């Protein structure tokens, strides 16, 4: 498996160590990407156990190398439970998820994930299905757009941005990343380095919001985490790397309470019930050395929990 053209795996040793791998166990990497984490897991199975790796992006298949005890599943990880049933797997020993968007996606101009390039406003992980980001910005009403930017981009001025988009699309269909940037920027051009930096951060949040909506990322994450909780054996490990507060909050909630909303369920005696024991009470972040070598690791947070 070669991650050279895709991305450098983040928190590689920390996340795989967190699985506490048994050489004969069954493991799942729900975010194959460049194959870096999968390759490390396979090296610790020594041909005795089995690894299932998921990725819905056809480009990820280019990184597959035939390996004993390895199965690649081209699918969204929200269908984890269905695929495990298909392969006759009732329980698993561990699951790893690196929820970051691969560098490959940001660097591929044709995918429309980055505001660095003028490209079709697509943003679909699976290019075969679903609405594009252009469909979202041209078809959703103003209220729905504002909600997306507020919930998924955490933009305080989401209503103003939505209003600007609606006015812009009345004059011209928004088809490219540059069309989108021009529409939400309006007439205001950064006048200094600080303003330019602030605008880049805002653009990153807006693009994040669109990407999450287009790919139904939060719904998919919720379903995957629910399936993982059902599939993990007692003593099985869940190792998840997050990159923004929305997904980190959901992962934290599931690990602490067993549900995505963070609702505490109590037994008859008032004791809070949870299916997990936290392995690390505080999030694990990349070392200064890793952050220097791989800047995308700066926002990464690793949480590990063990099924009770």
Roles of regions detected by a PLM:
Residues 1-308:
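S-adenosyl-L-methionine-dependent methyltransferase catalytic core, i.e., the SAM/SAH-binding region
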